[in-house]
Regions:
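Bilobed "Venus flytrap"/periplasmic-binding protein-like clamshell domains
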Residues: 5-26, 40, 84-141, 146, ...
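Periplasmic-binding protein-like
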Residues: 1-9, 80-89, 167-206, 216-223
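Short helices/loops that flank or line small-molecule/ion binding pockets
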Residues: 43-56, 137-157
């Protein structure tokens, strides 16, 4: 039985990584490969190892990098999950989306979800004057909490994964519903001959009782 290492975007393993162990176990039993889930504690670790992995559940940014620079093959994606943004302000501030126009907005500019937010704002004729760069989403929260920025853009999944105490540091003004970018399962090119078999197993999970239960725990209806 061939061994495969599976890695998952750290945002998706921050809480209850056991779900992904069950997912890898299911693939091992159904696809004929020993799929080993290797958890990354943070993004620097994930980014340093992802090109050596065999199977990856990657965010949109990393999906493009894996495809363009390393030849990874898209397998499938969660049918109903999209990467969206939340627009936030300081906890004690009263604000509307219109207040983002010509304002300085803290965000992580390199992440695609920032572009999702800007596209959503532009549709309403709103254009921030400048983007105040942060290296991480928590850096955006800290900039707002410390009074260095009044407005911010956050990755929705990051915000929802924050502790209740951390969420109290900001106030949500709005959230996007663009449904344009998403995480994707990517397979290393050295396993190109296994694409069809793996994809068949993954696409059939929703029609199998145990597979469907695993997907539900991952907040996925079907692949």
């Amino acid at each position: 039985m061939q061994r495969m290492t599976m890695m998952v975007c750290p945002h998706d393993t921050a809480k209850d990584p056991e779900r992904w162990f069950l997912f890898s176990q299911y693939l091992s039993q159904r696809a004929g490969h020993l799929v080993h889930f290797e958890q990354s504690l943070d993004f620097p670790e994930f980014q340093s190892k992802m090109a050596q992995a065999d199977l990856i559940y990657a965010n949109p940014q990393h999906t493009l990098k894996l495809f363009d620079e390393h030849g990874f093959i898209p397998l499938t994606r969660a049918a109903s999950l999209f990467d969206e943004a939340v627009l936030v302000t300081c906890a004690e501030c009263e604000a509307t989306v219109a207040d983002f126009h010509q304002a300085s907005v803290a965000t992580v500019p390199s992440m695609l979800v920032t572009q999702v937010a800007l596209k959503s704002l532009a549709r309403s004729g709103i254009a921030p004057q400048s983007l105040q760069p942060a290296s991480t989403w928590m850096g955006v929260v800290q900039a707002i909490y410390n009074g260095e920025a009044r407005f911010g853009i956050l990755y929705k999944d990051f915000y929802e994964g924050m502790s209740k105490l951390s969420r109290k540091q900001v106030r949500v003004v709005s959230e996007t519903a663009e449904r344009s970018v998403y995480h994707c399962f990517m397979l290393a090119p050295r396993h190109a001959d296994h694409v069809d078999a793996l994809r068949k197993v993954m696409l059939g999970m929703a029609d199998d009782e145990r597979g469907a239960a695993i997907l539900r725990d991952l907040h996925m209806d079907r692949l």
